[in-house]
């Protein structure tokens, strides 16, 4: 075989010409010490705050403390595989998570990795978890209602799209139940075709038991609500950095809907546990402690998270992200550090009480202490018309009920007030998993406020309500449709309703 030298040199030249000049440079550091989920790393001089780093074992961490001679890294996962002297390399990426509609119906961890065994996430877009909240100009004031399906909330403490409404109460008072009912109440909208009516739901479970989260997901599945929801779970057995980052990850997923002209609601359940996880991380990183040993920036931790919930203006696509943070109090102490912080950040709070819960008032909302600072600007006209009086009457009732315990001889007007209050309180009770549509709530509250229940025994109020709703659904569907479409209670509709309510009241007389 004849080999020509010219040919060989031509082949060599061709290969040399295409030889890649770029060499991959990665900055590598060394683990100085590791323990309690924190690694001290030497040699990562150019690492950014909040950057993801990777350890030899494949475990990831986030650089939080940038000191003169070392970097404090919190570890997302177990630190058992990490040994002193091992190498750590920069990834060059700030912590980000997958976002988009591909996450709907899935359960993921704090970094967006699936944990439900349904295969990889179908998502192409990623977003940073910690971004700046929208400024003042792109926002719009809250003006559309975010229906929870609960009479006590939609009538008295209305929540609007883009609002931040805190759910606060002791353990076992039904905080998660309110959030769950709100998610289930969005099902009818998702069955329809009106994209603007749809509200996508993001639920972040922080520091909860795995069994509790599994039960929550099962209820969503059984009720057909998982298909428009995303569940982010950083359970009690997960590392503190996971519990710290999960709310930010959930927020980034919710912001995808907000920024693309859609509407979403995010539930942080609960932020007390996130604050505890952050306190643990901060103390281990040797940051100076403040009140109740929380770090000085724990207020900023929650404010930068909750400020990202917003109603966007017309130029920014009209989307919205509503936040329902949950805070667990100890023995109804609302004046502790974290509760006062979050109350001051949010636009109102739904205050749940153990005593009410055990008296059978469920949802156990204390109407006197609960407020919505956005208030009636987020209510439909129909609801405003009927629910205007109810708050005042209940406030008077509570005041009188306290005095009535002492005196037996009460005048007629006081007796009337006490009667009405007892029946309105009964009317606001609602079993779990049975949210009501806005127009149905209007009918029920109309009956209560206009005195049709005053002569009824208290134990018949629920029966009256069921009969009223049954009659409207079977014989007056056109009335329900009319109120729903117009969002107002016209005189003609009010007269129709009056007739229906009066006929049912007669049957109870």
From Swiss-Prot:
It comes from Methylorubrum populi (strain ATCC BAA-705 / NCIMB 13946 / BJ001) (Methylobacterium populi). Pfam families: ATP-synt_ab, ATP-synt_ab_C, ATP-synt_ab_N. It comes from the Bacteria. Signal peptide: none annotated. The record marks 370 as: Required for activity. HAMAP family: ATP_synth_alpha_bact (MF_01346). One of its GO terms (cellular component) is proton-transporting ATP synthase complex. Belongs to the ATPase alpha/beta chains family. It is found in: Cell inner membrane. InterPro entries: ATP_synth_asu-like_sf, ATP_synth_asu_C, ATP_synth_asu_C_sf, ATP_synth_F1_a_nt-bd_dom, ATP_synth_F1_asu, ATPase_a/bsu_AS, ATPase_F1/V1/A1_a/bsu_N, ATPase_F1/V1/A1_a/bsu_N_sf. Keywords: ATP synthesis, ATP-binding, Cell inner membrane, Cell membrane, CF(1), Hydrogen ion transport, Ion transport, Membrane, Nucleotide-binding, Translocase, Transport. The gene is atpA. It is a peripheral membrane protein. Produces ATP from ADP in the presence of a proton gradient across the membrane. The alpha chain is a regulatory subunit. This is ATP synthase subunit alpha. F-type ATPases have 2 components, CF(1) - the catalytic core - and CF(0) - the membrane proton channel. CF(1) has five subunits: alpha(3), beta(3), gamma(1), delta(1), epsilon(1). CF(0) has three main subunits: a(1), b(2) and c(9-12). The alpha and beta chains form an alternating ring which encloses part of the gamma chain. CF(1) is attached to CF(0) by a central stalk formed by the gamma and epsilon chains, while a peripheral stalk is formed by the delta and b chains.
């Amino acid at each position: 075989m004849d080999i020509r030298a010219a040919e060989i040199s031509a082949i060599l030249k061709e290969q040399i010409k295409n030889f890649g000049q770029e060499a991959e440079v990665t900055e590598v550091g060394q683990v100085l010490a590791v323990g309690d989920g924190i690694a001290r790393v030497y040699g990562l001089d150019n690492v950014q705050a909040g950057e993801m780093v990777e350890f030899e074992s494949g475990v990831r961490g986030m650089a939080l403390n940038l000191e003169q001679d070392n970097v404090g890294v919190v570890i997302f996962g177990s630190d058992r595989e990490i040994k002193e002297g091992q190498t750590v390399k920069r990834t060059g990426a700030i912590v980000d998570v997958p976002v988009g509609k591909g996450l709907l119906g899935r359960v993921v961890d704090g970094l967006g990795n699936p944990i439900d065994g349904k295969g990889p996430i179908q998502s192409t877009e990623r977003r940073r978890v910690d971004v700046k909240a929208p400024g003042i100009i792109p926002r719009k004031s809250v003006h559309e209602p975010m229906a929870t399906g609960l009479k006590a909330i939609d009538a008295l403490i209305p929540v609007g799209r883009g609002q931040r409404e805190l759910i606060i109460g002791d353990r076992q008072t039904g905080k998660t139940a309110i959030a769950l009912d709100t998610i289930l109440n969005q099902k009818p909208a998702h069955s329809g075709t009106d994209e603007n009516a749809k509200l996508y739901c993001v639920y972040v479970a922080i520091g909860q038991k795995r069994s509790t989260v599994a039960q929550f997901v099962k209820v969503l599945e059984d009720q057909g609500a998982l298909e428009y929801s995303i569940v982010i779970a950083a359970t009690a057995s997960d590392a503190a950095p996971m519990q710290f980052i999960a709310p930010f990850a959930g927020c980034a997923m919710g912001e995808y809907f907000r920024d693309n002209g859609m509407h979403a609601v995010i539930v942080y359940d609960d932020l007390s546990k996130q604050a505890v996880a952050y306190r643990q991380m901060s103390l281990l990183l040797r940051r100076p402690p403040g009140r109740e040993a929380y770090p000085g920036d724990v207020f900023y931790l929650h404010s930068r998270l909750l400020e990202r919930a917003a109603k966007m203006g017309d130029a920014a696509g009209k989307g919205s992200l509503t936040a329902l943070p949950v805070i667990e109090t100890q023995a109804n102490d609302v004046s502790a550090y974290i509760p006062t912080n979050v109350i001051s950040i949010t636009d109102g709070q739904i205050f749940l009480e153990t005593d009410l819960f055990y008296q059978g008032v469920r949802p156990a909302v204390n109407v006197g202490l609960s407020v919505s600072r956005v208030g009636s600007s987020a209510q439909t006209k129909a609801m405003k018309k009927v629910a205007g009086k109810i708050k005042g009457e209940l406030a008077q009732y509570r005041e009188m009920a306290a005095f009535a315990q002492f005196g037996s001889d009460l005048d007629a007007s006081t007796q009337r007030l006490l009667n009405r209050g007892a029946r309105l309180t009964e009317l606001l009770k609602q079993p779990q998993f049975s949210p009501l549509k806005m127009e149905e709530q209007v009918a029920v509250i109309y009956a209560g406020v206009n005195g049709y229940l005053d002569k009824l025994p208290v134990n018949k109020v629920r029966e009256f309500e069921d009969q009223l709703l049954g009659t409207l659904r079977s014989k007056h569907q056109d009335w329900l449709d009319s109120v729903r479409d117009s969002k107002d209670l016209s005189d003609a509709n009010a007269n129709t309703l009056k007739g229906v309510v009066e006929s049912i009241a007669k049957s109870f007389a």
